[in-house]
């Protein structure tokens, strides 16, 4: 039975959503002390891509993804 490397076990699949014509890609990356950094990429066909790294840190990767997605929706609402 193959064993996963520790860095592979911490990787999560990015969450892709759309909001008001923007594409939001929330992702998480392993950080210090077992935390997960909430990262976000925001794309729109008529605007430059916005990349936000380590918006905040969470003990759970799912929480990081949820936070990054919610943060992105607020960002889009503020720019629209």
Predicted feature locations:
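N-terminal segment of the canonical double-stranded RNA-binding domain
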Residues: 2-39, 43-45
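A short, exposed loop/beta-hairpin motif centered on an aromatic-Gly-Thr core
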Residues: 49-63
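Short, surface-exposed linear segments at secondary-structure transitions and domain or protein termini
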Residues: 34-36, 59-67
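A generic "cationic amphipathic patch" detector
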Residues: 34, 53, 76-77
